[in-house]
């Protein structure tokens, strides 16, 4: 296959992805990164998924961390649709879409979000959410496509900045309900910190 490289001077990950979408020519679009390793026969997993569920416009798959383990807690079985939590937990390296479906629904990445902008994350969740709101059928397939070792933005950024950006992401997706999702995130974050602190105390004893 031929590889097409596009050089631009604009800044912003979402702008780059939209440029790639505009210049894409194949029937299926795989969103990837420059530091992933594709698993053997990943393309067969993709084709099989779309052949098995032809009414779907896109799928969220799984990816592995550098240790070869699942990078996240995923559903164990196929899902014909994504829950709100699964939408929020989407990463670009998990996503594959039909080119025609994105074109017909006029779906693009929101260029106000993503690396290179003030709101430096959440563009994938917004992209998936916008697709569902416009009628695209997006499911989940429990198959691994890539391994990806790069730490997430959240692992390298201050907590206050993360909450600021995620508040904007939640508002963009859920509108007036965004406060509920902020409160829910805070609850689970505090619960996680409590568990870590408790384990630390047990070790110290």
Regions found by a protein language model. Give the residues of each.
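Acidic donor-binding segment of Leloir-type glycosyltransferases
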Residues: 1-7, 48
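Glycine-rich, basic loop-to-helix element that forms the pyrophosphate-binding segment
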Residues: 8-24
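Short aromatic/hydrophobic "clamp" motif used to bind/position activated sugar donors
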Residues: 29
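Conserved donor NDP-sugar-binding/catalytic core segment of glycosyltransferases
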Residues: 41-74
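Short, flexible, basic/aromatic active-site loop/helix in glycosyltransferases
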Residues: 71-103
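Catalytic beta-strand/loop signature of glycosyltransferases that borders the donor
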Residues: 109-111, 135-147, 159-162
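Acidic donor-binding loop at a coil-to-helix junction in glycosyltransferase catalytic cores
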Residues: 114-127
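Non-catalytic, C-terminal membrane-associated alpha-helical segments of glycosyltransferases
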Residues: 157-205
């Amino acid at each position: 296959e031929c590889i097409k490289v596009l050089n631009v001077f604009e800044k912003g990950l979402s702008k780059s992805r939209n440029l790639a979408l505009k210049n894409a020519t194949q029937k299926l679009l795989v969103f990837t990164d420059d530091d992933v390793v594709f698993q053997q026969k990943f393309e067969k997993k993709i084709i099989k998924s779309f052949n098995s569920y032809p009414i779907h416009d896109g799928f969220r798959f799984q990816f592995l961390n550098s240790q070869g383990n699942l990078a996240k807690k995923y559903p164990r079985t196929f899902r014909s649709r994504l829950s709100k939590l699964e939408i929020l937990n989407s990463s670009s390296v998990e996503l594959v879409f039909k080119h025609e479906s994105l074109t017909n629904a006029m779906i693009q990445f929101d260029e106000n979000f993503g690396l290179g902008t003030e709101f430096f994350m959440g563009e994938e969740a917004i992209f998936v959410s916008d697709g569902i709101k416009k009628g695209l059928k997006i499911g989940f397939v429990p198959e691994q496509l890539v391994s990806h070792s790069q730490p997430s933005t959240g692992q390298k950024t201050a907590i206050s900045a993360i909450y600021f950006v995620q508040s904007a992401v939640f508002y963009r997706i859920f509108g007036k309900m965004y406060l509920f999702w902020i409160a829910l995130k805070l609850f689970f974050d505090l619960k996680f910190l409590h568990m870590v602190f408790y384990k630390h105390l047990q070790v110290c004893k």
